[in-house]
Design a protein with these regions (language model features):
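Hydrophobic/aromatic residues within transmembrane alpha-helices of membrane transport systems
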Residues: 14-17, 26-29, 33, 54, ...
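Helix-loop junctions and terminal segments of transmembrane helices
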Residues: 1-22, 90-93
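Interfacial segments at transmembrane-helix termini and the short loops linking adjacent helices
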Residues: 49-79, 125
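Interfacial transmembrane-helix starts/ends
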Residues: 23-38, 46-50, 68-71
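Membrane-interface helix-loop junctions in multi-pass transport and translocation proteins
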Residues: 51, 65, 95-98, 108-139, ...
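Interhelical loop/hinge segments that connect adjacent transmembrane helices in multipass membrane
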Residues: 13, 21-24, 149-160
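Membrane-interface junctions at transmembrane-helix termini in multi-pass inner-membrane proteins
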Residues: 76-106, 146
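Residue-level recognition of transmembrane alpha-helices
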Residues: 37, 71-74, 78, 104-108, ...
Length: 160
């Protein structure tokens, strides 16, 4: 939640900085956003470690058992989602969203059969693994495009 509060205003501020070609500000903001994301991931690790205790207090001891693997996979999914948001927010601010539109569509097409396959193979964990995979892919391409945009080397699909 804290990460979302920090990252939300970056979109419109990036638009202004990109139009004015103030790439130094974008780089500093990207660096700060990454630091907030890393801090959030660190807090997430602590939350995973304390999850059994918290679940017991919240839901009642012995009422339900949520495995560390389920909690850990949700943590990984949320971590990759935050990493994607660091770069995706900058990309959205530049307005260069054509690659995002195409790649998100491709990833959505991949996700459904992947989630079904992994769910049949691993149950709930399979669906969570599919989430981790698609957000890891989103993170990878968005980091690539964002770095190209900031370094002003984006061409083709990355600059549309």
């Amino acid at each position: 939640m804290i990460f979302t509060i920090v990252i939300t205003p970056v979109w419109s501020a990036t638009t202004d900085a990109y139009v004015r070609k103030v790439f130094e500000w974008i780089n500093k903001t990207l660096s700060f956003s990454r630091k907030v994301c890393i801090a959030s991931v660190f807090i997430g690790v602590l939350m995973v470690l304390a999850s059994k205790f918290v679940y017991g207090m919240w839901l009642g001891r012995g009422s339900i058992d949520i495995s560390y693997s389920t909690t850990g996979l949700i943590f990984l999914y949320i971590s990759f989602e935050m990493l994607y948001k660091v770069y995706g927010t900058i990309i959205n601010g530049t307005g260069k969203v054509f690659a995002q539109m195409i790649l998100t569509g491709i990833i959505a097409i991949i996700y459904i059969p992947l989630a079904i396959f992994l769910a049949n193979l691993c149950g709930l964990s399979g669906v969570l693994i599919a989430n981790v995979i698609v957000f890891a892919l989103n993170y990878a391409w968005s980091k690539l495009q964002c770095n190209k945009l900031i370094s002003q080397t984006a061409t083709g699909i990355w600059n549309k």
